[in-house]
């Protein structure tokens, strides 16, 4: 008999004893959806879950609003919500409406306040019922001696102990609250501690962990793998409100496919930011658009449906706007021509009242045109191919050929190359980029590079190396003015403007910019390097969708070569002409599209999970 059925029988037996003592009969118990929506008291453990994932804000953030959802509802509705950060207004008089069972994709430009909004909701800046426990994923697991599985399940073990203590206390009380006791039993049943380790292993396995990696202390893991541990805990806890800020960052393509499939079944409230249209299409049931007017606008459906609906709405709004403006112009023309004739003056006053009523009711606003900006890399002089050639290259970090990460690599790269490198995490994609740049040296074979070749590399950690106490304008002028001494201030501003940085974003300290805006500063600096080859290691991690499209267009018209490592299927499809897979110490050129590659990967993920079940991993 399972622990779940045993606890239920125990619950029913105790309930029967109490009711029999009162001379009453036992009524069939009913289970109505998620238990959290029925709690009558503040659940201290669910509060603890929020505290696991949030901390006091480092920077100044203020928010206000009015909770209007019902106290015991599993939904959240907050009216008149306003959010500021560093004194800058991000959201004004908007409505937060998050319904149980829905999965929301949160969209907005870089710097619009998406991450700050998630932090505000997780921190309960505007209070909502404590029975709705929340978890915000925005940081990696801390380094410690605890292994991945124990790190994940410890908080759940603590919650079970507290629930058992509460049940014991409620069961022995003089005046037993049967409804509350029932909800506590149901909550304990749903957790089922006997499955904790298996469930944790299943999630870790899905995100690419082997059995050996699961047993490693988190202090022995890289930041990327610790981020996966943190993501695994968020999925394991399964809070009533799960807030994920760019969860696909640090994942390889295979893990992204697994996460898409997992989150598509999430049956509580999910709010996720993502730069991947594929991900938003496969996961989300709704879209929230944080607009330039500082409003939260809600759309039903996934990203593609959102785009179609938004375009239709804007088309209809433009028609209504033009029609109304034409009507107003016609009325004003009549009023202007009325002169002093008494009967015409009366008509003119009547017509003016029509305009006054329109204005009082609110005129149709002209739709804002889509924000347009483009990344731009300067043209460079063509070099004869191959400008980079690998000849029988082998590489090992310890110099031992028996431990080689690569063997027998032979290929060429030229200025027409548009290569996307794919493969699992840990197979050496970033290492390959470092071999191309010369940062790493082969232990066998050689890499030849054309004399005068200039390369520029973007890595997912490039933004962390920016001088945070300087503004973007100060940074690029201090760094590149010796290279371009003739440039005036406006020309430097223009460089930043080419990458969507304008106004205060150019002159504010870099530390105050969003991660996406910091990434744009890095791209502006890369453009000033005027390279022949761009090496891009996860360039989309902090860019919004508009920025990614701008990057893709810039790459496609640029005259230099590009080698790309990315987990963004759409960007790969937009820019790559070749797919190279890193596998079994080799680099293999694939004869398929990225869409076909994703389909084959999805089949592999499904097969792998089936195998894991057979091996009792789950």
UniProtKB/Swiss-Prot annotation:
**Which annotated residues bind ATP?**
108-115, 423-430
Q: Which InterPro entries match?
A: AAA+_ATPase (IPR003593), ABC_tran_Xtn (IPR032781), ABC_transporter-like_ATP-bd (IPR003439), ABC_transporter-like_CS (IPR017871), ABCF_EF3_subfamily (IPR050611), P-loop_NTPase (IPR027417)
GO BP term, example: ribosome biogenesis
Report which superkingdom the organism of origin falls in: Eukaryota
Please give the PROSITE patterns that the UniProt record associates with this protein.
Answer: ABC_TRANSPORTER_1, ABC_TRANSPORTER_2
Q: Region Disordered: which residues?
A: 1-45
ABC transporter domain location is 76-325, 388-609
Residue(s) carrying Phosphoserine: 50, 53, 55, 64
Sorted alphabetically, the keyword list is:
ATP-binding, Cytoplasm, Nucleotide-binding, Phosphoprotein, Repeat
Record Pfam families:
ABC_tran, ABC_tran_Xtn
Question: Where is it mainly found?
Answer: cytoplasm
Q: List the disulfide bonds.
A: none
- Basic and acidic residues bias spans: 14-27, 36-45
Kindly give the SUPFAM superfamilies that the UniProt entry links to this protein.
Answer: P-loop containing nucleoside triphosphate hydrolases
What is the official name of this protein in its record?
Uncharacterized ABC transporter ATP-binding protein C16H5.08c
Q: Which organism is it from?
A: Schizosaccharomyces pombe (strain 972 / ATCC 24843) (Fission yeast)
């Amino acid at each position: 008999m399972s622990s779940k059925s045993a606890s239920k029988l125990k619950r029913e037996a105790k309930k029967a004893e109490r009711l029999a003592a009162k001379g009453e009969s036992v009524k069939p118990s009913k289970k109505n959806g998620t238990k959290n929506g029925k709690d009558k008291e503040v659940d201290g453990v669910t509060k603890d879950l929020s505290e696991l994932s949030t901390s006091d804000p480092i920077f100044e953030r203020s928010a206000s609003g009015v909770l209007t959802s019902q106290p015991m509802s599993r939904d959240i509705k907050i009216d008149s919500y306003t959010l500021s950060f560093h004194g800058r207004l991000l959201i004004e008089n908007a409505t937060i409406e998050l319904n149980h069972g829905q999965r929301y994709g949160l969209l907005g430009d870089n710097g619009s306040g998406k991450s700050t909004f998630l932090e505000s909701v997780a921190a309960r800046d505007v209070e909502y019922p404590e029975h709705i426990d929340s978890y915000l994923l925005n940081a990696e697991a801390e380094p410690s001696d605890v292994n991945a599985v124990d790190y994940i399940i410890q908080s759940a073990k603590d919650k079970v102990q507290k629930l058992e203590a509460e049940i014991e206390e409620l069961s022995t009380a003089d005046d037993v609250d049967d409804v509350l006791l029932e909800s506590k039993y149901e909550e304990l049943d749903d957790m089922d501690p006997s499955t904790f380790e298996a469930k944790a292993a299943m999630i870790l396995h899905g995100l690419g962990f082997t059995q050996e990696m699961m047993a490693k202390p988190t202090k022995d893991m890289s930041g990327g793998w610790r981020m996966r541990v943190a993501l695994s805990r968020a999925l394991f806890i399964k809070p009533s409100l799960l807030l994920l800020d760019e969860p696909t960052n640090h994942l390889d393509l295979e893990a992204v496919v697994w996460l898409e499939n997992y989150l598509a079944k999430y049956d509580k409230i999910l709010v996720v930011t993502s730069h991947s249209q594929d991900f938003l299409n496969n996961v989300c049931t709704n879209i929230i658009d944080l607009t330039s007017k500082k409003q939260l606008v809600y759309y039903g459906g996934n990203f593609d449906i959102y785009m179609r609906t938004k375009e239709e709405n804007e088309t209809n709004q433009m028609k209504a706007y033009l029609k109304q403006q034409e009507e107003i112009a016609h009325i004003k023309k009549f009023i202007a021509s009325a002169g002093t004739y008494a009967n015409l003056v009366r008509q003119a006053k009547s017509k003016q009242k029509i305009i006054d009523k329109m204005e009082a009711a609110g005129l149709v606003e002209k739709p804002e045109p889509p924000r347009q900006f483009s990344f731009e890399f300067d043209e460079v002089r063509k070099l004869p191919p191959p400008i980079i050639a690998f000849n029988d290259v082998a590489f090992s970090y310890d110099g031992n050929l028996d431990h080689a990460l690569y063997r027998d690599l032979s290929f060429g790269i030229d200025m027409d190359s548009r290569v996307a490198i794919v493969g699992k995490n840990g197979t050496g994609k970033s290492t390959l980029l470092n071999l191309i740049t010369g940062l790493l040296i082969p232990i066998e074979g050689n890499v030849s590079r054309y004399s005068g070749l200039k390369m520029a590399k973007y890595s997912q950690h490039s933004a962390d190396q920016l001088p945070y106490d300087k503004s973007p304008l100060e940074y690029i002028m201090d760094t590149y003015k010796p290279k371009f001494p003739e440039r005036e201030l406006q020309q430097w501003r223009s460089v930043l403007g080419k990458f969507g940085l304008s106004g205060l974003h150019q002159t504010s300290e870099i530390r105050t910019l969003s991660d996406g805006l910091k990434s744009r500063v890095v791209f502006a600096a890369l453009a000033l390097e005027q390279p022949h080859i761009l090496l891009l290691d996860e360039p989309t991690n902090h860019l919004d969708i508009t920025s990614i499209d701008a990057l893709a267009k810039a790459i496609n018209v640029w005259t230099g070569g590009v080698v790309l490592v990315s987990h963004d299927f759409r960007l790969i499809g937009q820019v790559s002409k070749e797919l190279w897979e890193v596998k079994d110490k080799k680099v293999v050129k694939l004869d398929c599209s990225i869409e076909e590659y994703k389909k084959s990967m999805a089949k592999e993920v499904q097969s792998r999970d089936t195998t894991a079940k057979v091996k009792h991993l789950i």
